[in-house]
């Protein structure tokens, strides 16, 4: 299971905000650090291709090498998101849109956490969610 935490900055002490996440990905899976500049054209989707759009904000991502989406990232508006794995017994589409794809879409388009949340919700309602996110053991 993933562990994600956030520590708020404090104006009185001058402390810095921290956002961190460990990864529960397969141990042999390569992760890439990727910079996506604003103004570039994003063509989202690991398994299901979604409509392309223009990236609104610079984004820094850590993502599995084979996947379009990301495990964790932050954009130039200081919006940060970490993917959390869910385990359930409900059937899922084998080739659906991954949660990590939605994470990247939100970071490339949102200027606030609230906006990022709405982007994820709206896209999930429009395109669904599913797909196999495993590397060695799908």
Q: Model-flagged regions — what are they?
A:
Residues 102-109:
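Second-shell loop/turn segments in exported
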């Amino acid at each position: 299971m993933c562990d994600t935490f956030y520590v708020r900055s404090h104006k009185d002490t001058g402390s810095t905000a921290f956002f961190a996440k460990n990864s529960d990905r397969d141990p042999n899976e390569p992760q890439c650090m990727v910079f996506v500049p604003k103004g570039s054209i994003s063509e989202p989707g690991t398994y299901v291709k979604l409509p392309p759009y223009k990236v609104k904000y610079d984004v820094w991502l850590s993502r599995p090498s084979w996947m379009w989406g990301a495990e964790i990232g932050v954009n130039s508006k200081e919006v940060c998101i970490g993917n959390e794995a869910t385990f359930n017994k409900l059937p899922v589409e084998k080739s659906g849109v991954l949660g990590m794809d939605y994470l990247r879409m939100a970071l490339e388009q949102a200027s606030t956490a609230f906006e990022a949340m709405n982007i994820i919700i709206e896209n999930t309602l429009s395109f669904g969610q599913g797909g196999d996110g495993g590397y060695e053991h799908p």
